[in-house]
Amino acid sequence: MNRNPDQNTLPNITLKIIETYLGRVPSVNEYHMLKLQARNIQKITVFNKDIFVSLVKKNKKRFFFDVDTSASEIKDRILSYFSKQTQTYNIGKLFTIIELQSVLVTTYTDILGVLTIKAPNVISSKISYNVTSMEELARDMLNSMNVAVIDKAKVMGRHNVSSLVKNVNKLMEEYLRRHNKSCICYGSYSLYLINPNIRYGDIDILQTNSRTFLIDLAFLIKFITGNNIILSKIPYLRNYMVIKDENDNHIIDSFNIRQDTMNIVPKIFIDNIYIVDPTFQLLNMIKMFSQIDRLEDLSKDPEKFNVRMATMLEYVRYTHGIVFDGTRNNMPMKCIIDENNRIVTVTTKDYFSFKKCLVYLDENVLSSDILDLNADTSCDFESVTNSVYLIHDNIMYTYFSNTILLSDKGKVHEISARGLCAHILLYQMLTSGEYKQCLSDLLNSMMNRDKIPIYSHTERDKKPGRHGFINIEKDIIVF
């Protein structure tokens, strides 16, 4: 039988804090389970809810002005959530409520509340690029890679998009300007900043505080719309989280990276926003085409890829002086696949100080082999490259997360060979190594190519783990 803590002892400050928070005298079990949370609970209790309500209303007015909800509804939702613990008796749910309320109390003002105050002046830093001149070249390159055979029976795992994406995009544009040391963007929106003819959906971001930001944003959307918002963590995408509404519609996603990784990601500054250097993005696109699913996307909408490719080609031409004359030298580098052991050997001696690169298609095998080498100089760039790199005894060791396309039995398709070369060049860019000659040869190797059919492809590495999620409505955190 539950008993109340002894009321005859001297006044217990911790007891009073918990009692005030719960709106009732805690049971013995509640007291002993929650007493270590007393500091967080006190912060929640003294938190100025009126100021918080005002900030959410201002966020609504600026970014969600077309959402039909009243100021009183927003206030009621906020006050209801901050008193939810008074009607909750499950210890696990109480811990979840305390954790999420603590995030709002300690971070919301600095992360999203700040977006409501006057912004610094935007420093216009756009360069005029002649993208049109690259469109025909991009079309030729992409046409030679448009070799996927679409299986009409295959169910594609594309997400449904929430109607709130346009509102969140407006918020994200301001967020990227205010928090440009901790959040940068890549993908179609970043290229749109260079070329306004590019269409974009949601805004792709890398940040150093992804979980906190997404929790704050999820609550902002919940308080404004009244909808249940769910945060999901996908095991096979490293440090990735996504916000979806109660109907499983995609709102925004984010990859989290360490600050030291953020510091070395090549980036450029446009209108107070940092974007991943388009050179780096171009290499990632070349790497991406080794993935059979991406080639299927290319087959369905080549023009979408064409305008992006042309934009990045013009950027590297302008920035690095790349001459597109078909001079390819030793590109793509020679690649030999061991299908049984799932390792591709890339001959790199013509371009780099290490003579070859062993590319593993199974990450766990690479990790085991690195341990056997007893080498502690590996570089982990997290989701930026989806791989660890190690150079040991003039050999690079790395992991490749995409499929490997074959043009014949035991023969690496040139699309994948270029993807592997691009993967190595990502390392060179991240470590300030030499890459421009190799980049020039790689891009020129994509010119004037005939289509080569795909014979087969390797399967992607299967990632273990379970899905994690935060369900605000049900007070559940599973990670």
UniProtKB/Swiss-Prot annotation:
It catalyses: RNA(n) + ATP = RNA(n)-3'-adenine ribonucleotide + diphosphate. Its EC number is 2.7.7.19. Ca(2+) 1 binds at D202, D204. Keywords: ATP-binding, Calcium, Early protein, Metal-binding, mRNA processing, Nucleotide-binding, Transcription, Transferase. Ca(2+) 2 binds at D202, D204, D253. InterPro entries: PolyA_pol_cat_Poxvir, PolyA_pol_cat_sf, PolyA_pol_nucTrfase_Poxvir, PolyA_pol_nucTrfase_sf_Poxvir, Poxvirus_polyA_pol_cat_C, Poxvirus_polyA_pol_cat_N, Poxvirus_polyA_pol_cat_N_sf. The active site is at D202, D204. It holds the Pfam family Pox_polyA_pol. The keyword RNA-binding does not apply. CDD domains: polyA_pol_Pox (cd20919). The keyword S-adenosyl-L-methionine does not apply. Gene3D superfamilies: Poxvirus poly(A) polymerase, N domain (1.20.1270.320), Poxvirus poly(A) polymerase, nucleotidyltransferase domain (3.30.460.60). GO terms for biological process: mRNA processing. Induction: Expressed in the early phase of the viral replicative cycle. GO terms for molecular function: ATP binding; metal ion binding; poly(A) RNA polymerase activity. Heterodimer of a large (catalytic) subunit and a small (regulatory) subunit. Belongs to the poxviridae poly(A) polymerase catalytic subunit family. Polymerase that creates the 3'-poly(A) tail of mRNA's. This is Poly(A) polymerase catalytic subunit. It comes from Monkeypox virus. The gene is OPG063.
